[in-house]
């Protein structure tokens, strides 16, 4: 190994900047920062069908469908203004030429993918679950005998009144909305089509095709009407409280939410979203009905990596006299192909609510830490997931000794050893934090008092570092908020978490900044938040997880209509066990809710916070790790970090643009060319076993795509990787500026 007196090679920042600007980017366009990329109309294509809790259930954008021997029940999502559900049940009962005289026998439904079939003798009654409604078909494999028009009689059962009918459509409804049946079409085996008609009398809908088309049709002959929901402008069948998680092995996100069907019913739905590399241009990955038939609300989702599954939890509003109205908690495992059984997580006459779950990204455990609020106290347990995707839980116990907790948050990315940080918001506006590991051992609770009351919070972490964003009342205001940030680190000695920094993240005087959500993107944290009151905007920005410093300029992702409430959630691919080097993006999901409609939208986001690729492992007994933060061309916050070295260890940082891979001192490989490298040091690691250097990046967009090599030397007199010089080497990184 080349011998150079390291202490003589102290770096001057102007020299670093000059050398940086003299480099040539090998592929500057490849690593340019990307604007937010839309996912596409994923939620506009929501359509699901599967067995759920013993029922064959389907759903589209604005309806639910159930299928049984009694027929197909179509329920429009009319929202909380409707006191009850108003379904329409359809069943083909007879057919014939010139009149419906031939009875259609009863039958049980069968299904494949999103199509339900009833075999009724030689006639097949089919329902295709589509996003916009049910497509009903009658398939004739034999030409019906006789003369005259082909008529199919469909029995209709509903509390809705007949509102309109003509030869093209029939509408059933009331003041809350209704159902429309229209678009009768005949199709033969050669693809020839003929427009039909329909009429309603008594309790029967008659579908009709002209005799001439029936006589000449190539078999099989299909008669196709279409069922869709009629949702008035004042309906409130909203999609609410979305949350998203990511699984690396599946290569998919799962977005969950709940839909209000009536004042006392709500369903839980899910939409898989492919990561870009597995889904191509079409990112929709399948839809699922997770819970149906109760008053289910506030869905939550977490990843269970070892099972290649997601765990979805929700709260059911229960009204059973003489018990008071309260909320119970339920959970089930979900994959793209399997829906696990529902497990009652917390069932009592008490009101359990505000549930949150942490993902488990390890491959050694299927335990997911779970917390909720009951009577102002926080309770916690561990959800277990078996190989058959059956959920269970361990004992439930109180996580706090004080009452008055109004919100609880837990880091959702899983992280190292299933180690998680929990944060509680008190009624007095303080934040309390506690460290939990995979077996629910915890350290003491710490309380953080703001200069003004905190009003909400969001949290994520990787098991060693955590990023917390909280809203705090603006100076002189009782309603407007700013957003502040705190970072926390894990100190192995004593199994403690310690706050490393607190700073303002978003502050616009006189403007409401609120509803933060956070996801770890590997080395950094992505923050999304809502800005504004009457007209609300959705902002997005990447921050370093060490000092809460911004890595890049904020992005305005979405602007809502006047009066629309914008609420977002985030998950990054790094949260599903992928590293910062392999993750491609994060998924941002939000609802735009105006009180009468609440559409879900999503956008893909690739943080331009630099690309760090390990090119050589470390050596020696200290196992210190090199990390790069905010390697962005706007990089005034660019940091080179050393983590997990002993407290007080002397270290030097080497940065070079040329690669040497020098060997000859034990197993160590010194990657940067030492003779042309810049050296920062010496410095000592802090009480949290970390060291860092701030290395600003100047030059603007002309430095995008430039790469340099980063490696640390750490003094080690006990087990040195390089005995001749008594030091260890950290892993070496190739860092590319974005």
Task: Give, region by region, the residue ranges found by the protein language model.
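Positively charged n-region of N-terminal signal peptides that target proteins for export
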Residues: 1-5
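Bacterial N-terminal signal peptides
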Residues: 7-18
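Residues that cap or anchor secondary-structure elements
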Residues: 23-228
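Extracellular, repeat-based ectodomains that mediate carbohydrate processing or recognition
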Residues: 24-66, 226-607
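Acidic glycine-/aspartate-rich tracts in secreted/extracellular proteins
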Residues: 79-80, 143-145, 157-160, 215, ...
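Hydrophobic residues positioned within well-ordered beta-strands of beta-sheet architectures
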Residues: 116, 136, 150-152, 196, ...
């Amino acid at each position: 190994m080349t011998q150079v007196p390291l202490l003589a090679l102290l770096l001057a920042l102007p020299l670093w900047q000059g050398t940086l600007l003299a480099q040539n980017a090998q592929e500057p366009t490849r690593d340019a920062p990307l604007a937010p990329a839309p996912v596409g109309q994923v939620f506009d294509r929501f359509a699901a069908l599967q067995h759920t809790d013993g029922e064959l259930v389907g759903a589209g954008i604005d309806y639910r469908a159930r299928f049984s021997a009694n027929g197909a029940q179509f329920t429009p999502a009319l929202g909380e203004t409707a006191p009850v559900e108003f379904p329409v049940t359809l069943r083909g009962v007879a057919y014939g030429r010139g009149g419906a005289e031939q009875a259609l026998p009863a039958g049980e439904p069968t299904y494949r993918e999103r199509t339900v079939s009833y075999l009724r003798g030689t006639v097949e009654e089919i329902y295709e679950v589509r996003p916009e409604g049910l497509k009903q078909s009658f398939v004739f494999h034999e030409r019906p005998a006789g003369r005259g028009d082909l008529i199919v009689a469909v029995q209709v059962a509903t509390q809705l009144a007949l509102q309109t009918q003509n030869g093209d459509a029939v509408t059933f409804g009331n003041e809350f909305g209704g159902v429309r049946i229209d678009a009768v079409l005949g199709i033969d085996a050669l693809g020839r089509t003929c427009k039909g008609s329909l009429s309603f009398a008594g309790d029967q809908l008659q579908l009709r095709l002209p005799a001439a088309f029936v006589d000449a049709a190539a078999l099989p002959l299909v008669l196709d009407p279409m069922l869709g929901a009629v949702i008035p402008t004042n309906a409130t069948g909203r999609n609410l409280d979305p949350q998203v998680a990511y699984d690396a092995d599946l290569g998919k996100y799962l977005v969950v939410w709940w839909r209000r069907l009536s004042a006392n019913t709500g369903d839980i739905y899910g939409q898989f979203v492919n990561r870009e590399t597995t889904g191509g241009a079409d990112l929709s990955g399948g839809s699922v009905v997770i819970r149906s038939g109760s008053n289910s609300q506030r869905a939550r989702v977490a990843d269970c990596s070892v099972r290649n599954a997601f765990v979805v939890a929700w709260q059911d509003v229960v009204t059973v006299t003489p018990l008071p109205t309260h909320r119970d908690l339920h959970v089930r495992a979900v994959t793209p192909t399997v829906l696990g059984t529902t497990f009652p997580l917390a069932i009592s006459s008490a009101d359990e609510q505000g549930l949150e779950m942490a993902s488990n990204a390890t491959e050694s455990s299927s335990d997911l830490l779970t917390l909720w609020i009951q009577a102002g106290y926080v309770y916690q347990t561990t959800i277990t997931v078996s190989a058959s995707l059956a959920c269970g839980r361990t004992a439930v116990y109180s996580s706090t000794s004080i009452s008055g907790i109004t919100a609880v948050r837990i880091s959702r990315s899983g992280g190292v050893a299933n180690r998680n940080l929990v944060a509680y918001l008190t009624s007095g506006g303080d934040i309390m934090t506690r460290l939990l590991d995979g077996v629910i051992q915890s350290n003491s609770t710490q309380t953080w008092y703001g200069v003004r009351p905190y009003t909400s919070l969001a949290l994520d972490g990787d098991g060693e570092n955590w990023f917390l964003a909280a809203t705090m009342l603006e100076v002189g205001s009782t309603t407007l908020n700013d957003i502040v940030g705190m970072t926390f680190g894990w100190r192995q000695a004593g199994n403690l978490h310690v706050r490393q920094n607190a700073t303002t993240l978003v502050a616009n005087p006189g403007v409401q900044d609120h509803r933060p959500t956070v996801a770890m993107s590997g080395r950094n944290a992505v923050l999304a938040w809502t800005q504004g009151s009457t007209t609300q905007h959705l902002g997005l920005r990447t921050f370093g997880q060490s000092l809460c410093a911004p890595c890049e300029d904020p992005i305005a992702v979405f602007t809502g209509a006047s009066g629309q409430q914008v609420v977002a959630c985030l998950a990054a691919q790094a949260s599903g066990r992928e590293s910062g080097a392999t993750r491609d993006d994060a998924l941002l999901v939000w609802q735009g809710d105006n009180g009468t409609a609440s559409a879900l939208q999503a956008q893909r986001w690739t943080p331009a916070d630099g690309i760090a690729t390990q090119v050589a492992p470390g050596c020696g007994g200290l196992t210190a790790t090199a990390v790069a933060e905010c390697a962005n061309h706007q990089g005034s916050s660019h940091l080179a970090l050393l983590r997990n070295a002993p407290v007080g260890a002397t270290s030097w940082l080497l940065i070079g643009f040329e690669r040497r891979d020098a060997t000859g001192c034990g197993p160590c490989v010194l990657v940067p060319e030492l003779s042309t490298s810049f050296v920062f040091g010496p410095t000592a690691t802090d009480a949290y076993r970390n060291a860092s250097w701030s290395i600003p990046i100047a030059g603007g967009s002309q430095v995008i795509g430039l790469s340099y090599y980063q490696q640390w030397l750490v003094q080690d007199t006990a087990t040195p990787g390089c005995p001749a010089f008594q030091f260890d080497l950290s892993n070496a990184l190739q860092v590319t500026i974005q």
